Amino acid sequence: STPSNSSAASDVYKRQDGTDNFPAKFLINDACVMAGKPFSHAGIIRFKGQLMTYVPGEGPCYRCVFKNPPPKDAVPTCKQAGVIGAMGGVIGSLQAMEAIKYIIGKGDLLTGRLLTYDALKMEFHTIKLPKDHHCAICGDNPTIHELIDYEQAECDMHK
């Protein structure tokens, strides 16, 4: 069920996650889940990208899938790993299409599915994602009731 076009537009345009660090991704997820607002997650690193959409009551949230942010230095920063600019264009365009589909109420959203893209192989895959009924934010008995401020190294693009 898609809300009216005007309410859908205000929901989607304010909640597109293309951030470059896990604390921000979890903060966006948690804030949207608490507010009952949909959002789209996207991430890239090197030649790979991923995308999923969360709609309240229609599938898993980001935390259902990824549980908690990784330890502070467990995942390389953008500077360490590298980001291919064209990947932002590919995944960003797909994320924009998710917003358009939501707004106009057409097509199948990536709710309950993670779309992955491997640019080196030119392959897309869709992974079915179940809702975690034990999820700390959207599960049957949530344990997170306020936003958490995680700390992690930011993607330093200026040095």
Walk through the language-model features, giving the residues of each:
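Single conserved hydrophobic/aromatic residue that forms the stacking wall/gate
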Residues: 1-13
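Glycine-rich phosphate/adenylate-binding loop
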Residues: 14, 20-159
